[in-house]
């Protein structure tokens, strides 16, 4: 593939607390704000905006107050008129869109890095929306090269930005960082350190790119979600009647084949994988997905070829 010249990136917004009980991002944003107060903006080589996304939920150490804010950034929700009955998170999403966007406009911030934790054994997972955002994919490739403490994986949702519903979709480029396993309402030092390294390396890549470094092309392994799987439920009460099978628990990104165990019913029976196509489970037994009726996602592994990139000179 031919080299691609891209405009310089004006900076990055690092956002934590979009879910108020995912504490690595909350404390990392607070630490970055402390460093800025102590050392000034020169503490980073590029402009960095820090945002505590959902302050009311952070204060109460809850995922959200009224509704999941990370589902409030679609074009339709951002354009919904605000009334007295509007959920807090819809109001806050529109505030953030005004601050960091507007979404799909030339005035939107160049990059958002939104910080999340998961109770699933996902390691460090980078989530974004397209297979053709070369800047974001190069950052993912850079992190995969530099971080060795945990596996670094890329998850692509591949939907139009207008339909994209999470905070990072407000920016021209952007991705969310998921690090786990970590219980909600808890901060683990090892998970915090991994998240901080990912943010530091993102800032480092942007600085090098803006300074003229040529980043060679290559392949990036990614996972694209195909479907979601609910827990087995009682047909009348809809209550769970099985849990994730011990042989599947904590094995996010493994390859599921027909006949592999998925669930263990509370009466002792094993529910097996019956799909013909082998797929990879993600976000296995994520605490926050119980209310969404999701035991795990199933994804297909894909290989994306990306071109060399360098900054476009004036």
Curated annotation (Swiss-Prot):
InterPro entries: AspA/AstE_fam (IPR050178), Aspartoacylase (IPR016708), AstE_AspA_cat (IPR055438), Aste_AspA_hybrid_dom (IPR007036). It comes from the Eukaryota. It is a peripheral membrane protein. GO terms for molecular function: aminoacylase activity; hydrolase activity, acting on ester bonds; metal ion binding. Its EC number is 3.5.1.114. Its cofactor is Zn(2+). Belongs to the AspA/AstE family. Aspartoacylase subfamily. Homotetramer. This is N-acyl-aromatic-L-amino acid amidohydrolase (carboxylate-forming) B. It comes from Danio rerio. The lineage of its organism: Eukaryota, Metazoa, Chordata, Craniata, Vertebrata.
